[in-house]
Amino acid sequence: MTEQVVNVIGAGLAGSEAAWQIAKRGVKVRLYEMRPVKQTPAHHTDKFAELVCSNSLRANGLTNAVGVIKEEMRILDSVILKAADQCSVPAGGALAVDRHEFAGYVTEAVKNHPLVEVIHEEVTEIPEGITVIATGPLTSKALAEKIQGLTGLDYLYFYDAAAPIIEKDSIDMDKVYLKSRYDKGEAAYLNCPMTKEEFDRFRQALIEAEVVPLKEFEKEIYFEGCMPIEVMASRGEKTMLFGPMKPVGLEDPKTGKRPYAVVQLRQDDAAGTLYNIVGFQTHLKWGPQKEVLQLIPGLENVEIVRYGVMHRNTFINSPKVLEKTYQLREQKNIFFAGQMTGVEGYVESAGSGLIAGINAARLALGQEPIIFPFETALGSMARYITEAQSKNFQPMNVNFGIFPELPPGRRSKPERAEMHATRAISTIHNFVNSQTI
């Protein structure tokens, strides 16, 4: 056992998982949690890993990427997955939990580990030494200022304004065309042209679609200069035409004419399998959101891998500042974990905490931090958040679209999912067996 102590700031899902992974490797942990001394607007208890929104950890089967990441975490002795499996409630094919039992299980497991010291106080200065920052979307203002000092002022954000991300394979390429505005540079956008009738129908559907109600602590986000597409639609017929749906300079090469309106799709990942819908940040509920997007020519059969969202968040521009080990590039003793890194979702947050914890422990023990294979769900998340387009970086759930491509061949969607899952689980087993993790 080393005498070095690793600091973990925040006892949410990511921080609790990181602390557990560090301690089980024989390294002392100093775990800071400001609740109940100082509460956040979203939490209601002083327990670790409190689930503040849904009690579902989403799909449990291996036909879904989130099911795969959960299985990988079980293989790596995740305390979050232990708690979830122990405290599960009936939910069909999903893994849902009794949130009070779940938080209680995690709290007791982490607190009772002999190498974990829990300190209930607000952290306003980043401690010396090896530190994992896992303070979540509601990071306190004082600490956020210190994080800005570490990452640079331009690389810390305070809200999500994410447009939907879709699978390229679900786009009808016969209805779209590749072109950049005024043909500047290489043709970098897929363009979905609309007639006036199509635009009017689309705009009306946007106005009538059901939105997610804002929480009290989220109501300031529109003043940051980023407006939801449905708000633009409601402000008048021309608002979107002078904004994200502006057709100027985007003549359709098939007709030589300018469409009435254009929806632009921009490549989102290095592999070119995912595209985001430019300027379409939205507060629409997911069901209505898909129905509205299917009115866009070329997207009638769209597969959405991340729905558009707008909510209060605190996250860093990971492609600019983070390594795939979850270390800060410029200060290798600092790790980030959880939603702060740009992973989205309970399970993904815990998964990032698992990797950050393993690597913080390795650093404390004088070992090299490790990068998880990209064929795994854990590795693909780490790769996505560090290789995504930094200019438009927004948080992302795990999905098969961010995994490395499969060998060539025509396959159904279930067949592709099965191949991704089989490869991921085989890879994580081989990785664990070949490393001292």
UniProtKB/Swiss-Prot annotation:
Cofactor: FAD
Location within or outside the cell: Cytoplasm
Cellular component, GO, one term: cytosol
Domain of life, per lineage: Bacteria
EC number: 2.1.1.74
Example GO biological process: tRNA methylation
Gene3D superfamilies, per the entry: FAD/NAD(P)-binding domain
Residues given in the record as FAD binding sites: 10-15
Predominant cellular place of this UniProt entry's protein: cytoplasm
Catalysed reactions listed for this entry: uridine(54) in tRNA + (6R)-5,10-methylene-5,6,7,8-tetrahydrofolate + NADH + H(+) = 5-methyluridine(54) in tRNA + (6S)-5,6,7,8-tetrahydrofolate + NAD(+); uridine(54) in tRNA + (6R)-5,10-methylene-5,6,7,8-tetrahydrofolate + NADPH + H(+) = 5-methyluridine(54) in tRNA + (6S)-5,6,7,8-tetrahydrofolate + NADP(+)
Keywords tagged on the record: Cytoplasm, FAD, Flavoprotein, Methyltransferase, NAD, NADP, Transferase, tRNA processing
Record GO terms (molecular function): flavin adenine dinucleotide binding; tRNA (uracil(54)-C5)-methyltransferase activity, 5,10-methylenetetrahydrofolate-dependent
SUPFAM superfamilies linked: FAD/NAD(P)-binding domain (SSF51905)
Function: Catalyzes the folate-dependent formation of 5-methyl-uridine at position 54 (M-5-U54) in all tRNAs.
NCBIfam families associated with the record: gid_trmFO (TIGR00137), PRK05335.1 (NF003739)
Family affiliation: Belongs to the MnmG family. TrmFO subfamily.
HAMAP family reported in the protein's UniProt record: TrmFO
Name of protein: Methylenetetrahydrofolate--tRNA-(uracil-5-)-methyltransferase TrmFO
